[in-house]
């Protein structure tokens, strides 16, 4: 308990000092890994609140080690292994390919996200899984897929599900300082 209290005091003191740390990453590696993340097909009604493929692309490009192919430059839009033509992706100089579908889970309000991840040059499926969750969890599912892709390609465990806790000070300089604990996605 004393350790937790000590850590909280350090946070409060550091926030009251009004020092702001800003880290800006302006470039990644010299030769980012080319990857095609095909927009996931959706077999349900309406539009989903979160685009899983966009979440994955955002995660992978944010670390600077990957360069995603724009959907407008794709020769086809496969959503499962049987629709993948490796020559198309080699022509586009892509090393990896991620495809997927999103469906309503039978008899529930949940959705099932099925994805498949391929090594284009070796014509090999590296991973595939069905993840189930609510529509509100689609972003988290996208982060989980990003973790799998990142680890398979780099050998390093992905950290895209990481959440950060931080303290926000309100009413500073007044008689009544309020502090609020906030939780944020890594991105």
Show the residue positions of the predicted features.
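Positively charged n-region of N-terminal signal peptides that target proteins for export
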Residues: 1-4
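Bacterial N-terminal signal peptides
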Residues: 6-14
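Sec/Tat signal peptide C-region and signal peptidase I cleavage site
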Residues: 15-19
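Amphipathic beta-strand/beta-sheet edge segments enriched in Tyr/Trp
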Residues: 21-22, 81-148
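Short beta-strand->alpha-helix linker/helix-N-cap micro-motif
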Residues: 24-87, 98, 104
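Residue position within the beta-strands of beta-propeller blades
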Residues: 99, 164-169
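Structural motif
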Residues: 107-113, 172-182
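Short loop/turn segments that connect beta-strands within beta-propeller blades
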Residues: 120-121, 185-187
